[in-house]
Amino acid sequence: MPVSLRFTNTLTRRTEPFQPLKDGQVSIYCCGVTVYDLCHLGHARSYINWDVLRRYLIWSGYAVTFVQNFTDIDDKILKRAAEEGSSMEAVSERNIDAFHADMDALGILRPDRMPRATRCLEGIRTLIAELEAKGAAYSADGDVYFAVMKHAGYGKLSGRDLADQQTNADGRVADAEEARKQHPFDFALWKGAKAGEPSFPSPWGNGRPGWHIECSAMVREELGDTIDIHLGGADLVFPHHENEIAQSEAATGQELARVWLHNGMVNVGGEKMSKSLGNFTTIRALLESGLSAMTLRLFVLQAHYRKPLDFTAEALEAATTGWKGLNAALSLGDLHAEALGWTPAEPMGNDAVVASESSAIDTLLSARQRFSAAMDDDLNSSGALAVLFELARPLRALANRLDRGDAPNHNDDDGQELLQRWLLLRELAAVLGLRLEHPSAPEEESDLDSQSIEAAIDARRLAKQSKDFAEADRIRAELSAQGIELIDKPGGITEWRRG
């Protein structure tokens, strides 16, 4: 495990050595999506960055427990359900399914646990009751608010000073509720029931939880009072993460998280990409446009996770070119192993670099060390990518020759060095979640590729959820005509195979 791993901690505003609470173990909580719509590129950036963090920690020898939530009850979900004439549950389930499909397409490892707010209601009610008993919360006309003036540390994450602030900190509370608050920054822990909205029983009357208390309760339930790392986008520093800290620490008297990491925003034309501004592009639309998942990963990882990421055609083109070269190098062992006389093995262990010449050993050891040094330096993914491109250069040249039909021309020592170089490239690429993509081509009897089939299955699932069974049957019949058989499994899962 690296002793030199350092992170820039939003809480302390310093880049610090990382030391987990328990040696060799890391507990991580990542704020998930509010499931009212499809995910956009901004979400992709967050979850690609944190996927790489998780992969690097695992590769470095840590046992990682990674928890990421779904916010499945929220004003935005209720608004979408009302617009569709649907239910909160239907909107949530549809978008949770879509989230999984998008993340799987991007090669993002699924979290170890994915709690939902609606399945953590008992923990939420318990936490609110504890805050009320300690004088940190108060009731007002069926609502319950957190009293920010009762928590001395409020503002320590965002740097906000309560004395200078006159606007509310809830982020999702209407102006009409301000009169009931003791301070403008007080935020809702429990919202009293409203006509026509789902509600749940509580000691304060029927209602539903506020946004921030959900995460505090899920962190506590899944990982305990104090965790190693808390993740999210920079837009969550205030109010969401500030409020999480306040309510959790007021209840437990313990530090919520040792390290807070926040990724920068994706910008379009100088503005943050967001659904509210209407300047967003969904992950699904990008992939359906022909952009490969690995190109999208490379685009994200070319920038440091804390810096803004400009979404431009030129940046995507550069990522496409870069991935084409890396993919060609990664393909060597799969496409040309016989011509090279290679017997590809599993990726090398973290310390196992073997070559027949000392210069080759030095080259590969240096590459591994520089990769680790970059990642240890606050997840410098662009520096790590530079090592991958350096490793790939002679492999890409060899791949180009083989594609032209030129016979390989190297002695045994050269061949061994190239094999070890390829194995190391494959290993380090996997740490960044980069995997070989074969060129698109007609597959067996069908011209449909896997991504198109999965998209059709998603469309069929949505049709069934909307009770448009005629459309669902049409999609099944269309796939069947192209040799694709669908197998529906319990839990709404659909598998497929080529007939």
Swiss-Prot record:
Domain of life: Bacteria
InterPro entries cross-referenced by the UniProt entry: Cys-tRNA-ligase (IPR015803), Cys-tRNA-synt_Ia_DALR (IPR015273), Cys-tRNA/MSH_ligase (IPR024909), Rossmann-like_a/b/a_fold (IPR014729), tRNA-synt_1_cat_dom (IPR032678), tRNAsynth_Ia_anticodon-bd (IPR009080)
First-level EC class: ligase
'HIGH' region, short sequence motif: residues: 33-43
Catalysed reactions, semicolon-separated: tRNA(Cys) + L-cysteine + ATP = L-cysteinyl-tRNA(Cys) + AMP + diphosphate
EC number: 6.1.1.16
GO biological process annotation, one example: cysteinyl-tRNA aminoacylation
Signal peptide stretch: none
Keyword Nuclease: no
Gene Ontology molecular function terms on file: ATP binding; cysteine-tRNA ligase activity; zinc ion binding
Gene3D superfamilies according to UniProt: Cysteine-tRNA ligase, C-terminal anti-codon recognition domain, HUPs
Any Gene Ontology CC annotation: cytosol
Keyword Nucleotide-binding on entry: yes
Binding site for Zn(2+): 31, 215, 240, 244
SMART domains: DALR_2
Cofactor: Zn(2+)
Pfam families recorded: DALR_2, tRNA-synt_1e
Motif ('KMSKS' region): 272-276
Keywords: Aminoacyl-tRNA synthetase, ATP-binding, Cytoplasm, Ligase, Metal-binding, Nucleotide-binding, Protein biosynthesis, Zinc
Residues engaged in binding ATP: 275
Subcellular location: Cytoplasm
Cofactor details (free text): Binds 1 zinc ion per subunit.
UniProt similarity note: Belongs to the class-I aminoacyl-tRNA synthetase family.
Quaternary structure, from the entry: Monomer.
Protein name: Cysteine--tRNA ligase
Name of the gene encoding the protein in the UniProt record: cysS
